[in-house]
Amino acid sequence: MCFFLSSLCPVVAERCRSLLVPEDSGVDVENGGKRTIPKSRNGMLGEDMDDAAPLESGLSMSDMQMGSFSTLKAAKRAEVGGTGPKVGRPRKLSVYNPREMSDGNPGEDCLVVGPSATVSHSEGLSASGKRRKQHLPFTVDDLDIMCGVPSPRSGAPCRQPLTCKSHSISSKRAVTGRRKPFDALLQDFKDNNSRKSQQADIPRPLATKVYCSGHSQRMRAVITSLYRESISGRSSLPQNEQTLALDANPQQQQQQHTLMSLNKVSECWWIWIKTPFCSGISMTQVRTTEGGDKVEVVLYAAAHLPAFTARRLSGYSLQRNQQAAHSGPIHVARSTLPFENPDFTGV
C-alpha cells in the first residue's frame, strides 16, 4: 500500500525542492511543474492559448517558452514581404536632377528636383534641412553700437561692434539710421571701454568706515609715538633689534598685546595692528604732513584680511629705506600671543 501511494504522490527533490510527479499518475501539480511564462510574454501570446496548438507563425507554446523570439520575428518578416526591409521604417528618397542624369528617367524612389520642380520648406527649414537662425530686426540703439554693414549674400546687417575689422571704415560711415556720425559713436565707444578698464584696475578699499574717535585714542598715541621716533633718529634700541619696549605710561602699557609692522614708502605708512579694542587684525594707514605735525589715521575692517596674513606677521622683518625722505630707524612692537602660535588660523 505504501509503495502504491508513493508512486502516485509527488516527491520533493532534495536540492531544488521542486515537485516530481510520474507521467502516468495523472496528478497536476502547479501547472504540471513547468515554469510559468512572465506577464510580458503572456500579454503577447494570450492567456487561452494551448501549449500543443501551433501558432499562425508555425511556433508552439513550448518554443515561445524556450525563448525563440528571433524565429518569430523572422517568420513575421517572411509573411510581410520576404527578406525586404523592416516594416514601419521609411525609405530614404534620393534626389534626382535631370541636368546630372544621363538617361533622364528617375527611379521609383527618386524625388524630382530641378528648375521646373519646386520644393516647399515648412517651419522655417532651409534647403540643407537645418533651421535658420532668425535675428531680431535692428533698432536705432543697435546701430549706434554695432557695425551695421549689410552682407553681400544675405543682406543682413553685420552685428559686430563698431570696431569690426571685417569691414572698412568707409562702408561703416555709409550706414544710415545712426543717431550720430560714425566717428563720434566710435570715439564714445572707445572712451567707455577705456573707462571700464581703468575702473577694473583700481583696487577697492577693504572697508569704508573710519575709526577716528572714542576708544581709538590709545591707538593714535601709540602710532604717533612710533612715527615720531622713527623720523627723529633718536632711538634707545639698536637698529638691528626688531622689538620696541613701550614707555612706562599706563596708557601705553595697555598696548602690550599690540602687533604692529610698519612699511615705509615715501611719506605713507601702512600698519598692521591688533589692539584690545579691535576684534582681529586691522590695516591702518598713517599719512603725515611735511613737518610731521598732523597724523591722519584710517583704520580698515579686520574681517577682509586673509588668514595667511596673520600667520606671516609673527615673523615679519623690516629693512631701512635709505632713499626715503625720512630714513629713520623703524621698530616693530611684537607680542607673544596669539600670533606667534603656529596653529593660529587668522580672524
From Swiss-Prot:
Which Gene3D superfamilies does UniProt cross-reference here? 6.10.140.670
- Swiss-Prot/TrEMBL keywords: Signal
Where does the record place the SCA7 domain?
A: 134-201
Quote the InterPro entries the UniProt record gives: SCA7_dom, SGF73
Pfam families, per database record: SCA7 (PF08313)
Where in the sequence is the signal peptide annotated? 1-13
Which parts of the sequence are annotated with region: Disordered?
Answer: 77-106
* Cellular component, GO, one term: SAGA complex
Protein name, please? SCA7 domain-containing protein SELMODRAFT_439258
